[in-house]
Amino acid sequence: MSTTIREALACSRWSRGQDFMGKRLALLAIRLLVSVNLLYAAIFLKFAGVTDSVALFTQMSQAVHGLVSQPVFRLGSGAFETVVAVLLLIPKTARLGAGLAVVWMTAVILSHIFVLGYGWYFVDALMVMLLAVIYLLLTRRQSH
């Protein structure tokens, strides 16, 4: 009987360790996916001045009655997304980066709902926000 109990304990320890490792890998995957997504959007769309990006930010600039010019709006959002991506890549600041990603994606989603309309960028923002929220939920006990 005692060997069966030891085997059961050994199995449970192993499975807990495996679950822990699986969670760590999932958290790393989420951080990498969100960071790569934000860096791609910043570097290849906003900083490069792709036609679609310029058109979206021109529309947003007109929506706020020209208070923020299109280049400042586009490059500023690209810079912010770059900072958030870097924060997500650093383990000690990943929760801050995820929180900022949630706030930023909320603004992006609202701008798509009220001004820009729905499309691939809207779906992308939803996915980034969902992943950032999942990251925050999975790491909430670590922050206490």
Predicted regions and their residues:
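Membrane-interface extramembranous regions
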Residues: S2-H144
